[in-house]
């Protein structure tokens, strides 16, 4: 065999081998590909099935929010009809999505898309939050006296925190050391130490009972909705002081369909440059410049229904009002709307972004529109 033949033989064998087993680099690339999805839990507007039915609607963020599938869920009332969804959160450590309804907390495995367990808790359930390490859940009762601290793996109660405040909205800080607890019957925002699960501070008082709220990434400021205000207030999470009172200019208050307050929903864009505020009566999102204090009103976006919640994509490009529009943050234009299998409009106050590599969640957003700048400028 001459030199040319000896050189060609390995190449020929390689070509034959690739033809038999396939081109492996493509297979490895497909296995490691990360897909970005928006998980929309319904019924996420009270128990209204006309806004998407019952279950989890999964949308492909990179494919113009195309509906990919519907995942069945539990959360039924005693009469067998779907109960109001109250909150949603995700744990990377358990690879599970957690959903609260009026009566129960359910854990659904993201790989199998099956319910691992569903448990009822004394006093019901409201908007939960999961620790950054995915191991601990702060679970409010349904506007009752206490929060349950729950093991995310088993659903067992670790401790109860009594505040007598009408437990409602709950948010873990990004660094995992503190949880922020808002009750419907108090004008202050409570702070719990996650090492001891004890209340250590109250922020405020604000001008009325605290409704939805958000925080910045460095956990120094909170932005709160309060009853009776078309606008928001700002508090100092370190000192506990109320700092600013901001009202929407150019719009009047009026009757609202849900929640009983003019502004129910507030969020910071991930870069913390803007505050986005819900205005139910006027069916608007109002945008404020957060690079100055107090924030300055910039623009308003008209929506198809009354908004009651707002959060954002992890990359800071899109806003997700509960009315189901997808809004480009930079241009402030609506780029698409969420629809179900039949083309009907989908709306929900309980949505979360999940990045999946195969059947494993590798990165998650939050149902709250929280700031994601971790250091004070």
Describe the residue ranges of each PLM region:
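Bacterial N-terminal signal peptides that target proteins for export
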Residues: 2-12
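Hydrophobic helical h-region of N-terminal Sec-dependent signal peptides
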Residues: 12-18
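Predominantly soluble domains enriched in secretory-pathway, periplasmic, or organellar proteins
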Residues: 18, 23-377
């Amino acid at each position: 065999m001459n030199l040319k033949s000896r050189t060609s033989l390995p190449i020929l064998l390689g070509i034959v081998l690739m033809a038999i087993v396939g081109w492996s680099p493509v297979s490895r690339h497909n296995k490691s590909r990360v897909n970005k999805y928006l998980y929309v839990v319904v019924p996420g507007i009270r128990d209204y099935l006309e806004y998407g039915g019952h279950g989890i609607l999964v949308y492909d963020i990179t494919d113009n929010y195309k509906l990919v599938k519907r995942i069945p869920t539990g959360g039924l009332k005693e009469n067998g009809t779907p109960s109001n969804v109250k909150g949603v959160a995700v744990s990377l450590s358990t690879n599970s999505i957690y959903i609260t309804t009026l009566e129960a907390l359910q854990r659904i495995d993201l790989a199998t898309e099956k319910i691992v367990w569903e448990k009822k808790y004394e006093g019901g359930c409201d908007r939960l939050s999961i620790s950054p390490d995915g191991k601990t859940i702060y679970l409010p009762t349904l506007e009752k006296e206490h929060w349950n601290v729950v093991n995310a793996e088993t659903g067992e109660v670790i401790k109860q925190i009594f505040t007598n405040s009408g437990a409602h909205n709950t948010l873990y800080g990004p660094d995992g050391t503190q949880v922020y607890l808002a009750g419907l019957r108090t004008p202050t925002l409570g702070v719990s130490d996650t090492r001891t699960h004890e209340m250590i501070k109250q922020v405020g008082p604000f001008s009325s009972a605290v409704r939805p709220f958000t925080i910045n990434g460095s956990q120094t400021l909170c932005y709160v909705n309060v009853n009776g205000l078309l606008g928001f207030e700002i508090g100092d999470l370190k000192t506990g002081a109320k700092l600013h009172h901001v009202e929407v200019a150019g719009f009047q208050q009026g009757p609202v369909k849900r929640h009983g307050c003019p502004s129910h929903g507030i969020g910071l864009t991930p870069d913390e440059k803007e505050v986005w505020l819900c205005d139910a009566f006027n069916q608007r999102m109002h945008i404020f410049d957060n690079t100055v204090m107090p924030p300055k009103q910039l623009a308003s976006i008209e929506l198809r229904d009354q908004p009651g919640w707002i959060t954002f994509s992890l990359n800071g490009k899109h806003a997700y009002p509960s009315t189901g529009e997808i809004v480009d943050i930079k241009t402030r234009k609506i780029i698409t709307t969420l629809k179900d299998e039949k083309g009907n409009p989908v709306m929900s106050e309980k949505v979360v972004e999940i990045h999946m590599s195969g059947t494993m969640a590798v990165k998650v957003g939050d149902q709250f529109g929280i700031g994601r700048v971790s250091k004070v400028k």
